[in-house]
A protein has these predicted regions:
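Transmembrane helical elements of multi-pass membrane transporters/channels
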Residues: 17-36, 144, 178, 211-215, ...
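N-terminal transmembrane alpha-helices
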Residues: 6-38, 42-43, 59-71, 75, ...
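Small-residue-rich hydrophobic transmembrane alpha-helices
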Residues: 48-108, 152-171, 283-350, 381-403
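Short alpha-helical transmembrane segments in multi-pass integral membrane proteins
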Residues: 1-19, 76-148, 196-255, 311-377, ...
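Hydrophobic/aromatic residues within transmembrane alpha-helices of membrane transport systems
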Residues: 24, 36-40, 51, 76-81, ...
Length: 460
């Protein structure tokens, strides 16, 4: 039993070799967004509400970019496993083209419908002046953030390809540089330090956009200046040719991932909108809770990425089913352990953390209780995340689409919608009930893992 779930030193060296750079990058990114959030929180509850609503909407765009490049990424990891540089070059081109298209479509949607989208979250009980102020701050923030769409999408194209070809340090370095640039500029521009004007939420947006360009310069610059290491980049832009057969394969395997990320993230946005109908205090309280949760979930989410990469490489290299299952079981055990540990830490700081924000006692108290509920659910989230990446690594993208998005829209969203519209249920039981739907997904995920249909080599 002991060796069933616990690996040897070589196993952990391999896992942490892949996971630690991703954890460091995501950890620093989330830690800095926590500091950003606290800085914006010092400006007041109303600007914080506006910014948090916009960030919730931008999350949908970010995950669409991630989903679009992930579909091709399944093939990149397996091409790397079979040492096929030409294959990697084609997947890189696919990512490049689709990420540009998503950036342009996303910018058009937010330019035309930004005001209506933000307004959906400001319908809860509370005074009209608060809602109008939050809308105004949100629109100013959004207008500047749109300038960061293209560099974000291109950075994702380069960074994901480097990670899938075994280079995790440079994306980490680019990410770290970007978050420090963001942090320093935030401090200067939000509060008007060193002779700069005091710009509040607009300063936060300018800092983020500049940091996106810095990250792109580092990651793309390194890729192009190390052509011997990154053979795929040689001639990558000479044409945009992608073989029809591969294009079909990526589209068939990858489209469910893109649609999945869009539906899942937009489902999360709808859930937030349902919660917001319980009162205007819910928006800032949820923002405080999700900021801490995002930092706490870094390790298990990064472990999920590692599960996908390690499983993809093993499947591409043709390992036996027994080996693949054994490694997968141990990876999931590490993931659950991280969820238990960080869930415990979140619960421990649930009372103290909301005290950092310049907001009302009612918002702080509500945030502390929401943090507790999130902390209890974290181990289950970590199991689901590892399961999702396992199924995806073998190309089971349609199954993961059913598992993730269909469940969200068929079950979670209607449940939250009905409870928020047709009952007087307060926010805490409403949030707890919606979170508890993860228990059902855990059962479904376990059945899918045991079936083993995900164990397949896509490169042959």
């Amino acid at each position: 039993m002991h060796h069933h779930y616990i690996g040897d030193k070589a196993f952990y060296r391999r896992v942490f070799g892949v996971a630690v750079p991703i954890i460091i990058q995501n950890g620093i990114t989330n830690f800095v967004s926590l500091l950003d959030n606290i800085m914006v929180g010092q400006v007041g509850t109303v600007p914080m509400s506006g910014v948090s609503i916009v960030n919730g909407l931008l999350f949908v765009f970010n995950l669409c970019v991630f989903g679009a490049s992930s579909g091709a990424g399944i093939f990149t990891a397996q091409f790397y496993g079979s040492k096929d540089d030409e294959g990697i070059r084609h997947t890189f081109r696919f990512k490049f083209l689709i990420c540009i298209v998503i950036s342009l479509v996303g910018a058009a949607i937010f330019l035309l419908g930004g005001s209506s989208l933000i307004g959906l979250y400001l319908t809860g009980e509370g005074d009209a002046a608060t809602a109008a102020g939050a809308l105004d701050h949100g629109l100013k923030y959004l207008a500047i953030m749109l300038w960061g769409f293209l560099p974000f999408a291109l950075t994702n194209t380069y960074s994901s390809t480097l990670r899938e070809t075994g280079e995790t340090f440079i994306p980490m370095l680019g990410g770290i540089a970007a978050v420090f640039v963001n942090l320093v500029l935030n401090y200067i521009l939000i509060f008007g330090k060193f002779g700069a004007p005091e710009m509040g939420v607009e300063g936060a947006a300018i800092a983020t956009v500049i940091s996106r360009y810095v990250e792109l310069a580092i990651v793309a610059g390194w890729t192009h200046s190390h052509k011997a290491r990154n053979a795929f980049i040689v001639g990558a832009y000479r044409s945009m040719y992608i073989p029809g057969k591969l294009l079909r394969s990526i589209t068939i395997k990858g489209m469910p991932l893109l649609v999945n990320e869009f539906l899942w993230s937009s489902g999360m946005a709808v859930l937030s909108q349902c919660y917001s109908t319980c009162g205007l205090d819910v928006v800032p309280a949820m923002n405080i809770c999700s900021t801490l949760f995002n930092l706490g979930s870094v390790v298990y989410l990064s472990m999920g990425n590692s599960v996908g990469i390690i499983m993809g490489q093993m499947l591409g290299a043709g390992h036996s089913e027994e080996d693949v299952r054994d490694t997968n079981r141990k990876l999931i055990a590490v993931s659950i352990a991280s969820g238990v540990m960080f869930g415990g830490l979140m619960a421990a700081v649930s009372e103290a953390f909301p005290g950092i924000y310049n907001t009302t006692d009612a918002v702080r108290h509500l945030a502390a209780q929401l943090i507790w509920i999130s902390a209890v659910m974290m181990p289950f989230g970590s199991y689901l995340n590892a399961t999702y990446f396992t199924l995806r690594s073998g190309g089971q993208t349609f199954v993961t689409f059913l598992f993730d998005s269909c469940f969200m829209w068929v079950f979670c969203v209607p449940l939250a919608f009905c409870l928020s519209r047709f009952t007087n249920l307060p926010i805490l039981p409403l949030y707890a009930i919606c979170q508890a739907t993860d228990f059902i997904k855990c059962v479904i995920g376990t059945v899918m893992l045991k079936q083993g249909k995900w164990i397949q080599n896509l490169t042959v």
